[in-house]
Amino acid sequence: MAGRILDWRKELERWLRPFLERLGHKTRRRMCPVYIWGLIGPGDRKSIQPMAERIALGAYDQLHHFVSAGVWDVAPVETELLIQADKLVGGRDAVLVIDDTAVLKKGTHSVGVAPQYCSALGKIANCQTLVSLTLAHGEVPVMAAMRLFLPESWTDDRARLKRAGVPVEYRAARTKPEVALAEIDRVIAAGVRFGCIVADAGYGLSARFRQGLTARKLSWAVGIPRHVKVYPVDVQMIRPVARRGRPPQRIPDTLSVAAEDVLTTAKWQNISWRTGTKGKLRARFAAVRVRVADGSPQRIKDKTHQHLPGEQAWLIGEHRASGERKYYLANLPAKTDLRALAATIKARWVCEQAHQQLKEELGLDHFEGRSWQGLHRHALMTMIAYAFLQYRRLATARSKNLPK
């Protein structure tokens, strides 16, 4: 056992070299592997004190300084993580999954903590929310980025932001989709390769998020609530006959309709998109081409304000065996078949696996500090640890497939 532990520690040190070069000072280069050893190694608690007691007696002050108090820039290390993630799973067949994960907290002093929706509990709870970006190929995810979302109770309180050490560039109020778009820009700037962005309805509901992805010339497939409005793909803009005065504005020749209503007459098919541990995963799917009602708002005829037709997209419905129904939009090409659409929208499940492992095995939610800097450094170390584990997983799989 001791020999195996020593072997993976040596392997970790070799793999970490590009990261250590970005850290600069020799003390930081020495503490980084120690911290990551502590995250990966045995032990129920992955906060600084118990890790120091297990792996580096007397190193508490140095580990604390490395993560919470030391003056060093995380940006170069974050960029290196993106580079390594791309090497592991990047490519045209990869997806970039946008999601968020909650870290439960007590009190009011930890940066970003507030009563807000906690996905793990399915209800409002006192927690921090980290917007996450996961690069994945098939069933192999690599957590590539995390950024803390700040609720209004924080962005409206300058003194509170300053006490928690929130950098000036992150103090303005931003929605989770806006945080995600900024992180996507960082991912793109690092040269990370992926074919499609996928996200749940928490992000897909945002027209600005979808439009932001399209403006960046990205393919996307996102969940939406059932009431999101769409138009027929062949909707036409017409100019009503004016009785007097200025010519009226052009309006759609039909009204927009809720997504769930559009699919009631669609052709539904049983589709298998992946083989899981218990066999093929199946559900009933239907898809039609539509124009999304996310253009400018305008009063149409004698109706209330509606949004004008936006870009063309696929509207996709899913009927699960449990009776649950889900709806999605995707700007994938019109020639995309139903199975490919289903496989793309279901690709986001891998981020849930990554979130679970980051918390249960690597201690993402064990950080006990209160500062912005400390939280993001700890999260970064857990992501690097996770990337190393995925590196070993892929290396092991390759070695098993080598000819004997």
What are these regions (language model features)?
Residues 1-24:
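Basic, low-complexity segments
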Residues 10-13, 122, 136-165, 169-173, ...:
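An anionic, glycine-rich sequence signature occurring as long contiguous blocks
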Residues 23-39, 43-108, 115, 221, ...:
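Electropositive nucleic-acid engagement tracts
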Residues 51, 92-106, 133, 196-205, ...:
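Short, conserved catalytic/metal-binding motifs centered on acidic residues
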Residues 68-152, 157-158, 162-163, 297-304:
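Active-site-proximal, Lys/Arg-enriched surface segment
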Residues 160-240:
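Domain-level cores of phosphate- or acyl-group-handling catalytic modules
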Residues 330, 336-345, 360-377, 396-399:
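Short, solvent-exposed helix-loop connector elements
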Residues 389-404:
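Conserved nucleotidyltransferase catalytic core and NTase-mimicking acidic/glycine-rich helix/loop elements
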